Regions:
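A short glycine-rich, Lys/Arg-flanked "PGG" loop and its adjoining helix->strand segment in the class I
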Residues: 137-149
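Conserved class I S-adenosyl-L-methionine
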Residues: 1-61
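SAM-dependent methyltransferase
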Residues: 134, 154-224
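C-terminal lobe and adjacent flexible extensions of AdoMet/dcAdoMet transferase-like proteins
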Residues: 218-257
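Short glycine-centered segments of the SAM/dcSAM-binding site in methyltransferase folds
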Residues: 56, 150-152
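Class I SAM-dependent methyltransferase SAM/SAH-binding core
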Residues: 66-111
Length: 257
């Protein structure tokens, strides 16, 4: 599947916000992205990146501002970019409600306009890997360009090693209002791609679409980062400790050479 086949607007839309942001979201999603988890994520990012007050941070694929607004509340100068107008509208509204400022811009991670501008780049909650391998590699090179020398990137994504051991072929989540969110998964071990068919049922109407995302084991992503111009690559679990094979999620930190 070529990179142009990825339809971000189909995946990241108002339906996604309904099930991942706001009241009544499924319990599984609350554990993943709810307020308590989001505050812990922001603290972990600050700690692993060793961010100083006023650090210039780019939240790449910032979504509805879950991380960007919390980093701004911690005293950092944050820019958030995302391809979804709906997500950016929600992000700006949340920033206003929190009394923080984030420079939100609509954009494409394949065409980043910055050169040496940021102290850190954040890419959180499986927001990387939706294109073909050449394009995914090019995204990392663009991230390196956006960072000042010595700046750091942090990525949080699925851990392929764990996924291969405990693959879930299907999952269903139910909103408090009865709306349904269901995924059928196929993990291809030859390409390290997770192919998903998602069905969303809201107000009695069903919509089904497909997408895929590239998964990584740490050594492969480390090598990709080295090739893109990074060094000092480290792998962590969700708690910031050393990465283990049984961690479902993987946090990777690297420094621009």
């Amino acid at each position: 599947m070529a990179d142009q086949d990825f339809d971000a607007a189909a995946l990241y839309d108002e339906d996604y916000l309904h099930f991942y942001a706001g009241p009544g979201i499924p319990a599984e999603h609350e554990r993943q992205v709810g307020d308590d988890r989001s505050e812990a994520d922001a603290d972990l990012i600050v700690r692993l990146l060793e961010l100083r007050p006023g650090a210039r941070v780019l939240d790449l694929a910032c979504g509805h501002g879950r991380i960007a607004n919390r980093l701004a509340a911690r005293g950092h100068a944050v820019t958030g970019t995302d391809s979804s107008p709906a997500f950016l509208t929600r992000a700006r509204a949340d920033a206003s409600a929190r009394g923080v400022h984030v420079d939100y811009r609509q954009g494409d991670m394949r065409d980043l306009p910055w050169d040496g501008e940021f102290d850190a780049v954040v890419n959180w909650f499986t927001a990387y890997g939706y294109f073909d391998d050449d394009t995914n590699r090019a995204v990392l090179r663009g991230v390196a360009r956006a960072l000042r020398p010595g700046g750091r990137v942090i990525l949080e994504l699925n851990n392929l090693t764990s996924a291969l051991r405990g693959h879930r072929p299907a999952r269903v989540a139910v909103h408090d209002d009865g709306d349904l969110f269901a995924d059928r998964h196929h993990l291809d071990p030859l390409t390290s791609r997770l192919h998903a068919e998602r069905t969303v049922v809201r107000d009695g109407r069903a919509r089904t679409f497909s997408f895929h995302v590239r998964l990584f084991a740490f050594p492969e992503l480390r090598d990709w980062l080295h090739t893109a111009g990074f060094t000092d690559v480290s792998g962590h679990g969700e708690d910031g400790g050393p990465l283990r094979a049984d961690h479902d999620r993987m946090v990777v930190v690297a420094r621009r050479a």
